[in-house]
Regions:
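Conserved alpha/beta-hydrolase "acid-adjacent" motif
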Residues: 80-86
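Conserved alpha/beta-hydrolase catalytic His-Asp/Glu region
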Residues: 8-69
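Catalytic active-site module of serine/aspartate enzymes centered on a nucleophile-bearing elbow/loop
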Residues: 96-130
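Active-site-adjacent alpha-helix of alpha/beta-hydrolase-fold enzymes
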Residues: 88-97
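Generic recognition of short, well-ordered alpha-helical segments
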Residues: 62, 85, 112-115
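Short beta-strand/loop motif that positions the catalytic acidic residue
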Residues: 67, 73-75, 79
Length: 130
């Protein structure tokens, strides 16, 4: 939601953006939308939104080859914010990465499909345990 700063006080706009984040729009409950609305309208919102906008401007792909640690990429197959092709590209560029897809899932698999996301992360952490 990096582009929401000018309209952050527009509740309907925040609700719409929140719904677009998920494959299953029912995940964007009123409680979640209320929480996000409060967050983007807090004093720290400008810093958060500024950080989000900086990620849009910075192309991380050119730096990924520098990462030498194991990486776990978990991607919603129905992500409309950052398309699945980006996950494939990141996976190719990260030498020690594994890529996991979650079907019927949008941009935030940890919120939309925690029952699938958490075991993937647990398994990855067990593998890299030193």
């Amino acid at each position: 939601m990096g582009d929401t700063y000018p309209r952050r006080r527009d509740y309907d706009y925040i609700r719409e953006k929140t719904e677009q984040t998920f494959y299953n729009r029912d995940v964007a409950t009123k409680e979640l939308v209320d929480e996000i609305y409060a967050t983007v309208n807090s004093r720290k919102a400008i810093q958060i939104i500024s950080l989000a906008k900086s990620t849009i401007r910075h192309n991380v792909e050119k730096d990924l080859h520098k990462l030498t640690l194991p990486c776990c990429i978990v991607w919603g197959r129905n992500d409309t914010i950052t398309p699945p092709e980006v996950a494939d590209s990141f996976h190719r560029l990260l030498p020690q990465s594994e890529l996991h897809w979650i079907d019927e899932c949008g941009h935030v698999p940890m919120l939309e499909r925690p029952e699938q996301f958490n075991p993937i992360i647990d398994s990855f952490l067990q593998k890299i345990k030193m």
